[in-house]
Amino acid sequence: MDHSENEAGLYAEYTYSIRDKFSLVAGARGDYNSFYDKYYFTPRGHIKWNITRLLTLRASAGLGYRSTNLVTDNIGLATGRRFAFDGYAWNGDYDFHTLYRDFNRMEKALTVGGSLTQTFGLVKPEDATLSFDYFRTQFYNQVVADQEYSATEVMFYNTDGRSYTDTYQVDFNWTPVERLDIFATYRYTNSSMTLDRPDGGRVQVERPLVSRYKALL
C-alpha cells in the first residue's frame, strides 16, 4: 500500500516579557497537507509567572493535528482478523486502497495544562524543589482501532464522542550534597474514549494499554 503525503507550513511567534517576573509566548502555525488537500491552523500559547523568587507558575495551551498511519500504528493487531473501515472490510467487495484513501486519518486535539514549582531548603537553602503538573488532552476527532466491535475484525472509525486524557504528576528533587540528586515522581492518568457499538449505541471505556499509576524513585 503506497501513498504520498507531504506537508508545508509557516510558524509565527510573539514573545512578551516583564523582566524576570512574567513572560508570554504566543504562536500560530499554518500547514498544508497534500494528501487531504487542506490547510490546518494550530494556535498555541505559553506563560511563565514567577509569583515569588522561589515559586513559579507555568501554563500552556495548544491545538494539534496528527495524521495517523493505521497499519504501522496497529501492526500488532494484524493477528488473523480483518481490518475494516467504517463497517467495510478490506478483503470483501471493497478495495483496501480505496477505503484507506477515503478514510479520515487526521486527528484533532486540544491540550491545556500547567505546573506549579516551589523551591525550598531541607539541609541547605534552596536545595530542593516540589512541583505539581496537570494536563488535559481533549480529542475532537480521533481514530479508533476497536478490537471489541467484532470477534473477526478490527474496526477503524472516527469518533467525535467524549475522549480525553487527564494527567496529574508530582515531582520531588533534592540535592543534599554536590553531585548527588534524589528524585521521585508519581503520575496518575485518567484516560477515557468513546466506542461505537454494533447496535448503534456508544459506550465510554477506559483507554487500553494506558497505565493509570506510575512512580519512579
Where are these regions (language model features)?
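Extracytoplasmic loops and strand-loop junctions of Gram-negative outer membrane beta-barrel proteins
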Residues: 1, 25-30, 81-101, 150-157, ...
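Outer-membrane beta-barrel translocator domains and adjoining extracellular loop/strand segments
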Residues: 1, 36-43, 70-76, 83-87, ...
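Surface-exposed extracellular loop regions of Gram-negative outer-membrane beta-barrel proteins
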Residues: 2-48, 174, 178-190
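Short sequence motifs at beta-strands and strand-loop junctions characteristic
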Residues: 2-6, 18, 37-39, 67, ...
